Each structure stands twice: as structure tokens, then as C-alpha cells.
């Protein structure tokens, strides 16, 4: 009996050993399979990235780069962003290969070790990229270490947050509209360009201006957006689908998702079958892998921190500084001056798309904390103002504190400029965007809350594009009497994309600043949504190349990002969810528009968030409808309350410093950093010269005496 018992124990032990050995072998085999798959994909993706870079450089060296190549210059991922996007692409392609080459039944098959896959790819865990100093009074450049409990929260090169689960054709990455016969909620999605043509476009520019908002109101929105989010495009994943095939032949595949032209589109005669469109960069999923759906990257910090001035990567931040000076200054242009005032330095990476715009002027693009700084001339103008203000602050702080070294001067000036952007945005800008909804969504500040998630949400990147409806068709330059400046005082918008030469060699920024103050934004109108300058001539700075359609790009990008439809977001915000023409008509207060939308989408559930949100009537005293007020208000409240370095958070500034900061204004920024001497007191409101303008001596100055240290 005892012998039998020992034999049973022995046999059981052998069986357990065999199972354990089998598991070990299977695990080793699984690890080897993962390693092999990742290795092959890395080779393929690295080649795609290198080929893309080489091709772009070659194209910009040619005499006739395309619209696509000009815009790609600004959307091209660099540095750590490039690495994060490349890892995301390797992760996704490796997963596809493992599904294809192994017995995996689906991507969530428990036999696949997702942690092992992530480490093999190089994704790692979401940990800070810098060492956190909990006692530092200054933000990190990357946005890491803001939240002490979760130091990577809000940092650059992380995924945009999802407030609702992503919606893709396959549940993972394929956008709706990719597969021709695939439906969404029982209906095929309309072509993005068709929606643009039938809903967004208009011909007559008469009566489109906003009688209550200055052009600066529009421009500040773009500044804030560029401070908060940026999703560069990814590269194509394989040699089968090159960018040439995407751009020239409209061949859909990998990350090429061309915007096809509908029948009778006028662009069919001049631009072939499509506008090329490359999908946004995305990052690796993170543990515990509850969702493997593609999540797009935010390449900049989620905080309102002037990252567009200083950068979101340490290497860039360092290049932007004048490290040879002990004054904490930002580097400025050494080749050109604006009547004694500084310009941003040129980005001397050759070739430059800005030089292509005027081949005889030889003026490159500017370098700034955000790569998009030279996309259009008014954006470059405000970048110039912010750069000058940093250096003005640093010099004044040095005068007050001669013993401060360059690093302290830089950090203190950076901190003040960050507070300036926060104050202007929340005190002056958001109240006239959200109108009567302001207090509902952004109540008075109650202090920092480390449980609030400050990350920019994916949907916000579409909600904030309401500003595209505010862009007028022309840009005006005005003289010191606010009269037309020079023989070409009013210029079509499309001639000012990538146009730095007009600043450097044709008048400086003062005439443009006066235009921002005295001219008006466009008013969003349900019948006149986006000017043709953006809808047909985007990134068409010369007659040699054909323009893009920003509205169609926005709609295609909604699908690229896996955005839930209009009604999902209405439900998220506690608003009604119309199901019929009558219901949609009641929400939009416009039967014709409601019918046009349903003729295209068939159901309100499928309406893309960008067009659905912008189609709503504006709230009282605001410039967005109820849905966008909810999405924007919620996001800005989280940006504020989840930021440990928010200017009002006790301990960030002293009480006297906070009192002083409350006097900042955009008008004073102009007075201190240009030769403009007459400004309005309320720069975002529509102003008529001379009635609404005052001398700069009547505008409060920022008193920096509270920054004088006691050692003095």
C-alpha cells in the first residue's frame, strides 16, 4: 500500500514537472515568437521612417514641392515624439503579424503576453522621462512631475485621453469609411469632402464678419490650441504602401487614408481623384491593456504652460535659449531686426518651405517651441510677441535681482509668461467663447486637486477646431493711424501660409498687430461656415500648387481618431439625442441644415463631432453651441484644477505677485514689445479706431517689484 502511495506521488510529481516544463517551453517559444515578429517589424518601420525623411528633404529641395510636402514639414515628428510614434507603429504592426503567423484567435488572446510585447518593442511603462524634484518651484519642460501621485500625467508624448471609448470599424484601428461596404449604425458614412462641399462651403464673403470680436480673438484661440495639443502624422508601415502611392495614386493602405473627391467636384479637374491624407501618430497601449484600440499621441504638454514658446523636449528647450548670456534670455534672430526689436531665430534646417514661397527673398521659417509657428503669418506674429516678452521680463528681473544667475532668470520669466497665457485665456478669452455657460463649466477656482486628470482629451482636439469657423478670407496690415499700410495692405489668407518673408522684408510685425486689433474675426454662420481660403486653398501659398480642404481634413481626422458620433457626445454632456429630422431640426433650429445633414449621414448618430458640434446655434454671449460649450468647458476646468503649478494655486506665486499678475493684458504686451502706441483696452472685442483706442500710457503695466528678492 505504501509502495503504491509513493508511486502515485512520484507519478504526480512527474506530471507536474512535465506541465511546468511544457509551460516554460511554451513561454520561451512565445517570447521567441514575439521577439522575431518585433525584430522584423522594426526593420520595416525604421526603413519607412527613414525613407519618409529622405523623401521629404528631397521634395523640399525640388522646384515644386506639393501642398502635402509643405504641410508635412510642420507635421513631421521629431525627437522623442518620433520615437514614441515609431514604437506605437511597431507595437501595432507586430500584433498584426502575430495574429497572422500564429494560432492567436484575437488580439486579447490570453496566450499572448502583452507586457512582453511592449518591452520587446521598447514601449515600457508610463514613467517620467526626467528625475522628479518635488521641491522645485518650476515646471519641467516635458510636463512630467506635475502630479506627484502620477508623475507622467499630462506629460508630452503620451496618449490623448479618451472620455468615451474609441469607435473603429474593427474595434481597434481601422477608421469608419475605410471599407467601402462597411456600415456604421446601418449606414455608410459620407465622403468627408462631400460633407464639406454640401454643408461647410459658401461663395459670398459679404456679411461674414463678427461685429463683436476682433481678429485677435481668432488668433488667440490658435495660440492656446498649439500650447495644449499636437498630433504629428505617422509614417506608412510597409514598402507596399509608400507615400508616393498614397499621394500620387490615392492608393489606400496602412496609414494612408486619402480623402476622395465626390462626383462633379471641381478639384477632380486639377488635383486628380483625391487629397492625400496620412493618419495621426499613435502610441503603445499601456498596462493593464483594458483597451487595445489605437490612441493618438499628444506631442506637447497638456498644461497651459507656454510650451509653444519653450518647447516640450529638453533638447529643443536648450536650443531655443541664449546660453552664452547670463541673463536667462531666449535666442533671437541675428540676421534680421524689426526696427531694433527681435525676431525669433530662423530654423536653419535646409531646405525650408518658407523659402519656397518666395525664392528670391530667401527667408526661412522661424524656430520656436512649437514646430507650427510659421504655418501662417499671424501665428508667427504672436510667437514673436511672446518671445520678446520673455526677454523683456528676464532683463527686468535681472535689474531687480542682479545676483540671480541665468537659469533662475530664465525660469522666473518662463513662469510669469506661463501665468500670462493662463490669465489671458481664462479671464479674457474663455468668457466670450462660452458666454452664459462659463460659470456652469468653469466655476471659480477652488485650488489644486491631484485627483483631477489634466490630460487633453481626444475629443477636445476636435471641439477646439471651432476656431476654423472664425478665420476670415483676408489679412490686413495697418499703419500708425490704423489706415491701410502700403500698396498691398490687404492680402488673401492663402498667400500667407509659410510666409515669413512678408514679416522680415515687408514691414515687420507692427502693421500685422494693428490688423489683429482693429479688424474682425469671421462669425460662425450655419450657412457660411468655413472660408474658401481654408476650404479650397489651405497651404496653397503660390499658384504653382493646389490647396487642401481644412474642413474635409477635420472630418477625415475625426474618423482617423475613432471619434464616437454626435449623439454619443450629446449623451455624454447630458443633452438630448435627436433621432429624427424633427428632433435634429429642434436642436439646430434650422430645418434646411438638419435635412442636409441627414441626407448625407442618414442618422444623427453618425454625424462627425466636428461638424455636428459646430452646426449648433451659439449659446447666449458665446461663440459655440451647448455641446462644444460642455466639451471645451470641461477640458479647461480640468486643465486648471489638475495643474499643480496653476498661477492661482497658493505657493506658486506670493500673494503680492498674484495681485500684480492680475493687471496683465494683451494690450500691454503689445505696448511693451512693439512700436505700436495706440491700443484698445479690450483687445479681443471688436474695436473701432480711434474711438476705442487709448495711448499706451493709459494701459496698466506689470509691476515686477514683488519679484525683488529680500537679499537686495
Swiss-Prot record:
Inhibited by small molecule methimazole (MMZ). GO terms for cellular component: basolateral plasma membrane; cytoplasm; extracellular space. It holds the Pfam family An_peroxidase. Residues 22-117 form a propeptide. Heme b binds at residues 225, 375, 468. It is found in: Secreted; Cytoplasm. Its cofactor is Ca(2+); heme b. It catalyses: 2 a phenolic donor + H2O2 = 2 a phenolic radical donor + 2 H2O; thiocyanate + H2O2 + H(+) = hypothiocyanous acid + H2O; iodide + H2O2 = hypoiodite + H2O. Residues 1-21 form the signal peptide. The modification 3'-nitrotyrosine is found at residue 482. InterPro entries: Haem_peroxidase_animal, Haem_peroxidase_sf, Haem_peroxidase_sf_animal. Its EC number is 1.11.1.7. The record marks 372 as: Transition state stabilizer. Belongs to the peroxidase family. XPO subfamily. PANTHER family: LACTOPEROXIDASE, OXIDASE/PEROXIDASE. This is Lactoperoxidase. It comes from Capra hircus (Goat).
Amino acid at each position: 500500500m505504501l509502495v503504491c502511495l509513493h508511486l502515485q506521488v512520484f507519478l504526480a510529481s512527474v506530471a507536474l514537472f512535465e506541465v511546468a516544463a511544457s509551460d516554460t517551453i511554451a513561454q520561451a517559444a512565445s517570447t521567441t515568437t514575439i521577439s522575431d515578429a518585433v525584430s522584423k517589424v522594426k526593420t520595416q518601420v525604421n526603413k519607412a521612417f527613414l525613407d519618409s525623411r529622405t523623401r521629404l528633404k528631397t521634395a523640399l529641395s525640388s522646384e515644386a514641392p506639393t501642398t502635402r510636402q509643405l504641410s508635412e514639414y510642420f507635421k513631421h515628428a521629431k525627437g522623442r515624439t518620433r520615437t514614441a510614434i515609431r514604437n506605437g507603429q511597431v507595437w501595432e504592426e507586430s500584433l498584426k503579424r502575430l495574429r497572422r503567423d500564429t494560432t492567436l484567435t484575437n488580439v486579447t488572446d490570453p496566450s499572448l503576453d502583452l507586457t512582453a510585447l511592449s518591452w520587446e518593442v521598447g514601449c515600457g511603462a508610463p514613467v517620467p522621462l526626467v528625475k522628479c524634484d518635488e521641491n522645485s518651484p518650476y515646471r519641467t519642460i516635458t510636463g512630467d512631475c506635475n502630479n506627484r501621485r502620477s508623475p507622467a500625467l499630462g506629460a508630452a508624448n503620451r496618449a490623448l485621453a479618451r472620455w468615451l471609448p474609441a469607435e473603429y470599424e474593427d474595434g481597434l484601428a481601422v477608421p469608419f469609411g475605410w471599407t467601402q461596404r462597411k456600415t456604421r449604425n446601418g449606414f455608410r458614412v459620407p465622403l468627408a469632402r462631400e460633407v464639406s462641399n454640401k454643408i461647410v462651403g459658401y461663395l459670398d464673403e459679404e456679411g461674414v464678419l463678427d461685429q463683436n470680436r476682433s481678429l485677435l480673438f481668432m488668433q488667440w484661440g490658435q495660440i492656446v490650441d498649439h500650447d495644449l495639443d499636437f498630433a504629428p502624422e505617422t509614417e506608412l508601415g510597409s514598402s507596399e504602401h509608400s507615400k508616393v502611392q498614397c499621394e500620387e495614386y490615392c492608393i489606400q493602405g496602412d496609414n494612408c487614408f486619402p480623402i476622395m473627391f465626390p462626383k462633379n467636384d471641381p478639384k477632380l479637374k486639377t488635383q486628380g481623384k483625391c487629397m492625400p491624407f496620412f493618419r495621426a501618430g499613435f502610441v503603445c497601449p499601456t498596462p493593464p491593456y483594458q483597451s487595445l484600440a489605437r490612441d493618438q499621441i499628444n506631442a506637447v504638454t497638456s498644461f497651459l504652460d507656454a510650451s509653444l514658446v519653450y518647447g516640450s523636449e529638453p533638447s529643443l528647450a536648450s536650443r531655443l535659449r541664449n546660453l552664452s548670456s547670463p541673463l536667462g534670455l531666449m535666442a533671437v534672430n541675428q540676421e534680421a531686426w524689426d526696427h531694433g526689436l527681435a525676431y525669433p531665430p530662423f530654423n536653419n534646417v535646409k531646405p525650408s518651405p518658407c523659402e519656397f514661397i518666395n525664392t528670391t527673398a530667401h527667408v526661412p521659417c522661424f524656430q520656436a517651441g512649437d514646430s507650427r509657428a510659421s504655418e501662417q503669418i499671424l501665428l508667427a506674429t504672436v510667437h514673436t510677441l511672446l518671445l520678446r516678452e520673455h526677454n523683456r521680463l528676464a532683463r527686468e528681473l535681472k535689474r531687480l535681482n542682479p545676483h540671480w544667475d541665468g537659469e533662475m532668470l530664465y525660469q522666473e520669466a518662463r513662469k510669469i509668461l506661463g501665468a500670462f497665457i493662463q490669465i489671458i485665456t481664462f479671464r479674457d478669452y474663455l468668457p466670450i467663447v462660452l458666454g452664459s455657460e462659463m460659470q456652469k463649466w468653469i466655476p471659480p477656482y477652488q485650488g489644486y486637486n491631484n485627483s483631477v486628470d489634466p490630460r487633453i482629451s481626444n475629443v477636445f482636439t476636435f471641439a477646439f477646431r471651432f476656431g476654423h469657423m472664425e478665420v476670415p478670407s483676408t489679412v490686413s496690415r495697418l499703419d500708425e493711424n490704423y489706415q491701410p499700410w502700403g500698396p498691398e495692405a490687404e492680402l488673401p489668407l492663402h498667400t500667407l501660409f509659410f510666409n515669413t518673408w512678408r514679416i522680415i522684408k515687408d514691414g515687420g510685425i507692427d502693421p500685422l498687430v494693428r490688423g489683429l486689433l482693429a479688424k474682425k474675426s469671421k462669425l460662425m454662420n450655419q450657412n457660411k461656415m468655413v472660408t474658401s481660403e481654408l476650404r479650397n486653398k489651405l497651404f496653397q501659398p503660390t499658384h504653382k500648387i493646389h490647396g487642401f480642404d481644412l474642413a474635409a481634413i477635420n472630418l477625415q481626422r475625426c474618423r482617423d481618431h475613432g471619434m464616437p458620433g454626435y449623439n454619443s457626445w450629446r449623451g455624454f454632456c447630458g443633452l438630448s439625442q435627436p433621432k429624427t429630422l424633427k428632433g435634429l431640426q429642434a436642436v439646430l433650429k434650422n430645418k434646411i441644415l438638419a435635412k442636409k445633414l441627414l441626407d448625407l449621414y442618414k442618422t444623427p448618430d453618425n454625424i462627425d463631432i466636428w461638424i455636428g458640434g459646430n452646426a449648433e446655434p451659439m449659446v447666449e454671449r458665446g461663440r459655440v453651441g451647448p455641446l462644444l460649450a460642455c466639451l471645451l468647458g470641461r477640458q479647461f476646468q480640468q486643465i486648471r484644477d489638475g495643474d499643480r503649478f496653476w498661477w492661482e494655486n497658493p505657493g506658486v506665486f506670493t500673494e503680492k505677485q498674484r495681485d500684480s499678475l492680475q493687471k496683465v493684458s494683451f494690450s500691454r504686451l503689445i505696448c511693451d514689445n512693439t512700436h505700436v502706441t495706440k491700443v484698445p483696452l479690450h483687445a479681443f472685442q471688436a474695436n473701432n479706431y480711434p474711438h476705442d483706442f487709448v495711448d499706451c500710457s493709459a494701459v496698466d503695466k506689470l509691476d515686477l517689484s514683488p519679484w525683488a528678492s529680500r537679499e537686495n
